[in-house]
From Swiss-Prot:
The keyword Lyase applies. InterPro entries: RuBisCO, RuBisCo_large_chain_AS, RuBisCO_lsu_C, RuBisCO_lsu_C_sf, RuBisCO_lsu_fd_N, RuBisCO_lsu_N_sf, RuBisCO_lsuI. Mg(2+) binds at K167, D169, E170. This is Ribulose bisphosphate carboxylase large chain. PROSITE patterns: RUBISCO_LARGE. Coiled coil: none annotated. Its main location: plastid.
Length: 441
């Protein structure tokens, strides 16, 4: 069975048991009245069941309801259908004031009907020939307004300076100031030029997101013809059907697949309504993607750190034990579905490098947008600074030093022999983003 953990906030006067049962029924065979066609099927076999209700500590009005829906209610290999069934109608339900899907358990029998990520972590490392460290990326800014040639130039400078990947911003599709084909060509030129000069494999996440599936495949085909290693998709705005289509194309044609989660906060920001990102992350692993953005943890609160690491493990590991302190409501066995690399991006710079290296470990992508391009000397030194900081942190960690305690010291030592890093350290020494975390247990 597929198990779902909901946080239910019933309307005043509605007991939590009734609200939980209503949620389970609406996600399966129930409707608002008894119908004669009920007699034509075995409702006992197909109905959803609410099997557990517990109070949410510290919140009088809400309860955590765990519902089970039989695997036969879902189409094989379709995340779209899974969500339509599990969360389709029930969120507008009159009896519940608010409803949040906290976690799903996907049984191995259902997991096996999905292709999952086109390649996974190990295959990606082998393709890129990069081992033993996180992968470095950078989003090209300003995200809108550059011409294709200048955009390609920015890409080249970053890759030449020492980054592994650069990235199209999620909003860069094919706008009047830069059509997709021109961008693809100039970025491919930047990739090949920087590869030839550095002897490392480089890539640029070419955003193939478009208005129709056919147009997306057309862009992916063009990327494959250019011989570039990776394309990108906005999986929530593009939709799961489009995402799975593109993921299948990527596996068949040897393209890596980077996933951006634009629009996720619309769904996962509220504590009492919507869906937690760990559900969207699980869905992405089934639908297919080699990288997915997953927040940064750095500079925020500890509570959020555990929760973020919870869904990061759900993305990377084969088997994840139930652990309520990290927000994981069910044990999840992925049965050999390839892993997804979590991408840390958003407001990070060289001073965060020790923390990022420690928190995310080697299997991750660290993405610095402004943290590369904001360097006072330009993109290439900015990229060089990030690479030096990363190598210093990995080396220190391998020597057994404590990155959490000695992080700043490690960066300062490295800055002594890298003027680029020293300049970066100077620029970003005071910047902090101090806000309360939304996502606490």
């Amino acid at each position: 069975d597929i198990l779902a953990a909901f946080r239910v906030t019933p309307q005043p006067g509605v007991p939590p048991e009734e609200a939980g049962a209503a949620v389970a029924a609406e996600s399966s065979t129930g409707t608002w009245t008894t119908v004669w066609t009920d007699g034509l099927t075995s409702l006992d076999r197909y109905k959803g069941r609410c099997y557990d209700i517990e109070p949410v500590p510290g919140e009088x009005x809400x309860x955590x309801x765990x519902x089970x829906x039989x695997x036969d209610l879902f189409e094989e290999g379709s995340v779209t259908n899974m969500f339509t069934s599990x969360v389709g109608n029930v969120f507008g339900f009159x009896x519940x004031r608010a409803l949040r899907l906290e976690d799903l358990r996907i049984p191995p029998a259902y997991t096996k009907t999905f292709q999952g990520p086109p390649h996974g972590i190990q295959v990606e490392r082998d393709k890129l020939n990069k081992y033993g460290r996180p992968i470095l990326g950078c989003t090209i800014k300003p995200k809108l307004g550059l011409s294709a040639k200048n955009y390609g130039r920015a890409v080249y400078e970053c890759l030449r300076g020492g980054l592994d990947f650069t990235k199209d911003d999620e909003n860069v599709n094919s706008q009047p100031f830069m059509r997709w084909r021109d961008r693809f060509l100039f970025c491919a030129e930047a990739i090949y030029k920087s590869q030839a000069e550095t002897g490392e494999i480089k890539g640029h996440y070419l955003n193939a997101t478009a208005g129709t599936c056919e147009e997306m495949i057309k862009r992916a085909v063009f990327a494959r013809e250019l011989g570039v290693p990776i394309v990108m998709h906005d999986y929530l705005t593009g939709g799961f059907t489009a995402n799975t289509t593109l993921a299948h194309y990527c596996r068949d044609n040897g393209l890596l697949f980077h996933i951006h989660r634009a629009m996720h906060a619309v769904i996962d920001r509220q504590k009492n309504h919507g869906m937690h990102f760990r559900v969207l992350a699980k869905a992405l692993r089934m639908s297919g993607g080699d990288h997915v953005h997953s927040g940064t943890v750095v500079g925020k609160l500890e509570g959020e750190r555990d929760i973020t690491l919870g869904f990061v493990d759900l993305l990377r590991d084969d088997y994840v034990e139930k652990d309520r302190s990290r927000g994981i409501y069910f044990t999840q066995d992925w049965v050999s579905l390839p892993g997804v690399l979590p991408v840390a991006s958003g407001g990070i710079h060289v001073w965060h490098m020790p923390a990022l290296t420690e928190i995310f470990g080697d299997d991750s992508v660290l993405q610095f947008g402004g943290g590369t391009l904001g360097h006072p000397w330009g993109n290439r030194p900015g990229a060089x600074x990030n690479r030096v900081a990363l190598e210093a942190c990995v080396k220190a960690r391998n020597e057994g030093r404590d990155l959490a305690r000695e992080g700043n010291e490690i960066i300062r030592e490295a800055a002594k022999w890298s003027p680029e890093l020293a300049a970066a350290c100077e620029v970003w020494k005071e910047i902090k983003f101090e806000f309360e975390a939304m996502d606490t247990i």
